[in-house]
Structures are given as C-alpha cells and as structure tokens.
Amino acid sequence: NFPSMLLETFDPPTGLYWEGEYNVDRPCIAIVGSRRSTLYGQNVARKFATELSRLGFCIVSGMARGIDTAAHQGALTAGGKTVAVLGCGLDIVYPPENLELSKHIASVGAVISEFPFGRRADRQNFPMRNRIVSGMCEAVVVVESNVAGGSMITARFAGEQGRLMMAVPGRIDQVSSAGCLLYTSDAADDLRGG
C-alpha cells in the first residue's frame, strides 16, 4: 500500500505508519498554505478541495491550522478521500484542536507519518513531511504562503520532484500572499522568457 508516486522521488521515506485505509485508487492533489491564513484563503482552499474531490481526486495536506485544515474539510464535505501527512508520530495529534478532524480523516481516508510513535512535532519535522505531501501527488496547489513559509518548501520539493505546481494569487497587501505572488510572478517571467 506504499504510495507508488512517492517511490519515484529522490528521498522516499523508508516506511510509513498509517491510520485508516490507505488505499488511494485515484490521483492525488496537495492543497497547502499558511497556518495564519485569511478567511478568503480558507474559503478558497475549501472550495478547491470540494470541487477537486467531486472530480475524483484525493486531497493531500498536512493537517496544520489554516489552509491545510480547510482543504481536508472541503474534501470531507464533498464525501471525497483525503490524506493527512503528519510532522509527528501518529499517536500525537498536532494541532490538538484537530483531534476530531483526524478521526474523521482516518474513517474515510488516512492519516500517515514517517515518524515513530512518541515523536513530537518540531520545526525540523515539517520540511521532511512536506516532501511526502508533494511526493505522493501529481500536483501541488499553494493557497496563501509568505515568502519563507513551509508551503514554499513544499512548492520547491514539487518542482524538484517534477510535480505540477500552482499558486493562488492573493492580495498584494497581504503578507500571507507574498509567496504565492512571488511564485506567480516568477512563473510569468518564465513564460515571457525573462
């Protein structure tokens, strides 16, 4: 049941722990973004996840506050499959307020981690988690991220892994949109040959 696309990456995990049914029989798309998201960003993530789920995609995210939570909720609202990739052991729910969300995800999809039981969430775990989020997906959609946000790390991994990378442009006066705006600006430069 190991995610086949993840095996194609340059640094796949040696193993995965999971809760629920990890039997994803459909293409996966990651929806990631800022923990300090705006209401607009949460609504966009929820809507994208709902619509993509209805089209048959499995939604993958990191179950963090903000955009990740909204993406999982959108998939669940549509009756779709969703996978949460944790930056801690399966026995630890992080953030704690997502306990019910974690249970719901495990009942219809899966909660997975490469970290052993007892491993707490810390800053160095999240970039490791992000390579799994992008690695098991065909595409990554970033909805709100500052320039140095973890979602931009996921975007970088997506590029290195040959995955399609998309960003939702946001308001130019929002710090939470700066990373997406930078990405869309760079992509536009590439299209213009700049």
Predicted feature locations:
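Single conserved hydrophobic/aromatic residue that forms the stacking wall/gate
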Residues: Y183-G194
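Glycine-biased, small-residue-rich flexible motifs in mid-sequence functional cores and linkers
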Residues: N1-S185
